[in-house]
Amino acid sequence: MKGTGARYFWANGVLHPIANVTTARLLSPDSKLTTVQASAASLENIPRGAQIGLPDVPDDVPLPDMLSKQWLSCDMESGYHTWIAKDLPADNFPVKQATSALVQASGSGDKYFVDRKKGKKYYIDSSVSRLGDWALSFQNLASYPITVEPEWLDLFPSGTPLRPWSYNDIENAGQPATNLPGDLKNEGITIGMVLDQVDSAGQVKNSYLVIDDSNLVVFNSTAARLYQDAPPSKKFPTEMFKYVEPVRAVFVGDDWPDVEDFEAPEWFDESRDAASRTVLCAKMDTTDHAKPQFDLVTMPEKRAIEASYDAESLQSPKGPSTTRNVTVAGGSGALLALTSGGGGEAASYVFVSDLGFRHSLGDVPAVSMNALGWSASEAASVPRAWGELIQPGSEMSPKAAATSVGIK
């Protein structure tokens, strides 16, 4: 309204005061929201209705090119904190890439190895006494894991648990493997043996475990380190493996990291002073909406604590708003399609607003996105655990908007 700045939404001959433009957009999903200026006099005799405005939603939503694409979630002593922005300034977030980490979920005795390259967490099975620190070059570090919140640990999907296994765990170990593919069956190979595939220069390209009389299992350097009482391995040229189609064994992880990743994990070093302590962080970049990139990094603890309270830490024009555990750049937000990662499940579409809430887009998200100026192709497909870092807020859908003001 000219002269006053008041805003109204017209519906069915009634003017409704507008608490936020977002709700008004959702109330006109088909026609798109149009704005006109009018004088107070011209609106004098038009009936007034209830104020419209879903609670805890942004006044307006960002255009597609202002949607956030960078996430950083750090686990600190006080709990995890997540920063979301179109860009995270390197000066304010001085992160350093980590190879791996030894962690323990808060409130649990379970320990995990988190590997950056694999992007997974691996349960360390301590129920078997043979799993000594020496097996994977932990030395004594397994006794000093970094305690993290379960929600933060859930950002890393689970891999095959790490546990030692023995020659005697293999059924029929030592028996001839007479049905192996190709010429391998004529080499006197027995079940339980490790076969190395070597190139013309004598370099080992792949290793396999003979799991039964006809099948091989992929066998990497970590599997070799965890294999107890193994018989001597045999080497064969690459051409002898051309008919091999590896299978899986329940006690050997084909997703295990290489043994080199275990040499220098991040761990809890209580001898560090406050100035040198770091925190573990997970990083996500959704520039490619279909294939986000993930990373494991560390950041100085002092800076992480400062950034969790610093309203200007993202250098955003409006200044971000903060809630319990998230800082979202003001005027931005993240449009997400949350998935379980397992396939066969429809994505859940949500919007993370600069108020620090995760808003469902309702039962028909395409209609909600259309009303707000977005399309499904602009939503980043990310694991559900990332969305669940953010506390839920009001649903942002035409149905929720109409219900909030009693408009049918």
Tell where the protein language model's regions lie, with residue ranges.
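Short, surface-exposed polybasic-aromatic patches that bind anionic ligands, especially phosphate groups
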Residues: 1-408
